[in-house]
């Protein structure tokens, strides 16, 4: 007889945890832009969701930002021959070791390898190099050969 209240209590707790987990990160907005010009016209750069200084031909941009904090995540593609235009945005190359990235799980376009505690050896094997941004509290991971970059707020 006493197992019924315990079971109901456990169910109520599980439901509360599920609801609370589902409501976390509700202030995170995601957006997609075909070109850098489109992102600029929408105000993504002026609002700080997208870093200033991306190469002019940057395309296929995905942006996520938290309205309740300064957290942000993004990815973009650029022509590899315009990589030199990206370098002023970046500081010195740093190690992946000790870095973490924890975007909300609902940001489905964010790579699995760039979630949680980062595995430097695996990431370097994919061609990614990591940099601290030269003028913001961002981390950038760039695959120069593929012309693809990712950025996120330092945790």
Predicted regions span which residues?
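Bacterial N-terminal signal peptides that target proteins for export
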Residues: 1-11
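C-terminal motif of bacterial Sec signal peptides marking the signal peptidase cleavage site
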Residues: 19-22
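Bacterial signal peptide processing site
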Residues: 24-26
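A short, solvent-exposed beta-edge/loop patch
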Residues: 119-155
